[in-house]
């Protein structure tokens, strides 16, 4: 079965079985909602078990979650450092124009017909996502995911078209 990363358990939260998760999910509110099915993977990326979310809330930059049948710190402490993943079957359907991060990472990024680089990772610093574009012989480019910059994301043909606004590329 194919799985995709949605977060990393970085610590426990209190004594009642809550965990602090650093999300890397494109749809965190959907992914961590009550009833969601996720999988735990250990630090060697080995499947451990399926889990069900029973509660979720945001606190600062973290998602605080609790699993079904794990209601005390002693039951969850061993999961610190583990990765949460969603199976392909549990990803859910997308609306037109939406996509998953794993579909974008690795895509080539073009301005007109000039290859700029490849999407290396996607950051979530605040109001909009920022795509990190790895370029050959240059520093990584931080590309805000906003309409004037990202013109088209063609998932089937695996390419991203952009228009770099003045000041975005400090190496040109």
From Swiss-Prot:
Keywords: Chaperone, Cytoplasm, Ribosome biogenesis, rRNA processing. Gene3D superfamilies: PRC-barrel domain (2.30.30.240), RimM (2.40.30.60). One of its GO terms (biological process) is rRNA processing. Pfam families: PRC, RimM. It comes from the Bacteria. Residues 95-168 form the PRC barrel domain. This is Ribosome maturation factor RimM. It comes from Streptococcus pyogenes serotype M49 (strain NZ131). The gene is rimM.
């Amino acid at each position: 079965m194919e799985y995709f990363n949605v977060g990393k358990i970085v610590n426990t939260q209190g004594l009642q079985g809550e965990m602090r998760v650093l999300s890397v999910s494109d749809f965190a509110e959907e992914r961590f909602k009550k009833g969601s099915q996720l999988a735990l993977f250990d630090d060697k990326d080995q499947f451990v078990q399926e889990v069900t979310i029973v509660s979720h809330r945001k606190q600062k930059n973290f998602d605080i979650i609790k699993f079904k049948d794990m209601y005390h710190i002693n039951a969850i402490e061993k999961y610190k450092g583990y990765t949460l993943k969603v199976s392909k079957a549990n990803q859910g359907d997308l609306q037109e124009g939406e996509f998953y991060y794993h579909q974008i990472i690795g895509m080539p990024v073009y301005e007109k017909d000039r290859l700029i680089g490849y999407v290396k990772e996607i950051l979530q610093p605040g109001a909009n996502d920022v795509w990190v574009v790895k370029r050959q012989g240059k520093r990584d480019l931080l590309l805000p995911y906003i309409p004037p910059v990202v013109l088209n994301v063609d998932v089937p043909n695996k390419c991203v078209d952009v228009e770099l606004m003045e000041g975005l590329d400090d190496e040109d």
